[in-house]
Amino acid sequence: MIKSKVSEDQRRQMIAEAAYFRAERRGFNGGDATTDWIEAEAEVNERVRQIESAHLLQCLEEGLATATKKLSSLKRKASSVASGARTELQRDVDKLSELREALRSGVKELRAQGEQAGQLARRQAEKVWDELSDVMQRLGSRTSH
């Protein structure tokens, strides 16, 4: 899973500061602290969503580049191993290639949606990312022996 860029504590701190600055702008006269908080929360949530979207896209693009390098390396290794091991390694290479293409498609979709990227698209991309990471880790430990 891709780690969140903004923690819940940081988010709450940002909301508190934004609410404070709202009250400060009106000279701490009038207004309602609850309304300040709710409006600040909406602003901060939007900013955090933008930050998280950019962070997710960056992580997925980095993962895609890593998967492409790993796939090239595994293809070279597969051609030089014994035929019995080659079949198993080739299945893993094919699986990694399939996952890489799914991730590439997800990244392309997220990039096209930009700020409008939905939670479903993000979850799907993260799921593919998790599977891809598992396969790369398993292959890395198997081929390093």
Which residue stretches match the model-derived regions?
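Intrinsically disordered, low-complexity, basic-enriched segments
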Residues: 1-145
